[in-house]
Amino acid sequence: MNYQIVNIAECSNYQLEAANILTEAFNDLGNNSWPDMTSATKEVKECIESPNLCFGLLINNSLVGWIGLRPMYKETWELHPLVVRPDYQNKGIGKILLKELENRAREQGIIGIALGTDDEYYRTSLSLITITEDNIFDSIKNIKNINKHPYEFYQKNGYYIVGIIPNANGKNKPDIWMWKSLIKE
């Protein structure tokens, strides 16, 4: 696959395409985080602000996915967002973007990446039960993917679950927190 990695901040057309991808990809899931171009454009503008990292992947001069990284702690930053145009999903675009992001993060001295991956639509076993102090750790350990939740994509790329916020998005709608060390041992 021939592709080009581009800095979204350097081109207003890329920013517009990035906002469109954000709206299209999340609306396809039923997620209203960015229901329109105004909210999506605002999100893209925040993602391209310094010192954040934000870049996209072009195929045939068209943006098909993009990724961002922003400070969370001094040496561990938060991945936000990773989004791929629906017609390019499951074709390796996300993995390419993720590996490029990890390499750029290492070059800047970042030693870990954290991310939150919400389960707002009952796509994991965590959303099927009431999480309590007594069952939280077993529930995380025994998580099952019910309907193509992206946590498995991140696991395949070296991230692991470090915790959850049980009702982050409403009753039985957890935010699953994941992390990966970038230290090469």
Swiss-Prot record:
**GO molecular function list:** aminoglycoside 6'-N-acetyltransferase activity
Q: Which GO terms describe its biological process?
A: response to antibiotic
| Catalysis: reaction(s) | kanamycin B + acetyl-CoA = N(6')-acetylkanamycin B + CoA + H(+)
Listed PROSITE patterns: GNAT
Q: Which lineage is the organism of this entry classified under, starting from the top rank?
A: Bacteria, Pseudomonadati, Pseudomonadota, Gammaproteobacteria, Enterobacterales
Any one Pfam family match given in the protein's UniProt record, by short name: Acetyltransf_1
Q: What is its EC number?
A: 2.3.1.82
Q: Which domain of life is it from?
A: Bacteria
Q: Tell me the NCBIfam families matching this sequence.
A: AAC_6p_Ia_fam
Q: What assembly does the database describe for this protein? A: Homodimer.
**InterPro entries with a match to the protein in the record:** Acyl_CoA_acyltransferase, GNAT_dom, MshD_Acetyltransferase
State whether keyword Cell membrane applies.
no
UniProt KW Acyltransferase keyword: yes
Q: Which UniProt keywords apply?
A: Acyltransferase, Antibiotic resistance, Plasmid, Transferase, Transposable element
Residues that bind acetyl-CoA: 147
Return the broad EC class.
transferase
Where would I find the N-acetyltransferase domain in this sequence? 14-183
Residues holding substrate: 34, 73
Q: Under which name does UniProt file this protein?
A: Aminoglycoside N(6')-acetyltransferase type 1
Functionally, this protein is described as follows: Catalyzes the transfer of an acetyl group from acetyl-CoA to the 6'-amino group of aminoglycoside molecules conferring resistance to antibiotics containing the purpurosamine ring including amikacin, kanamycin and tobramycin.
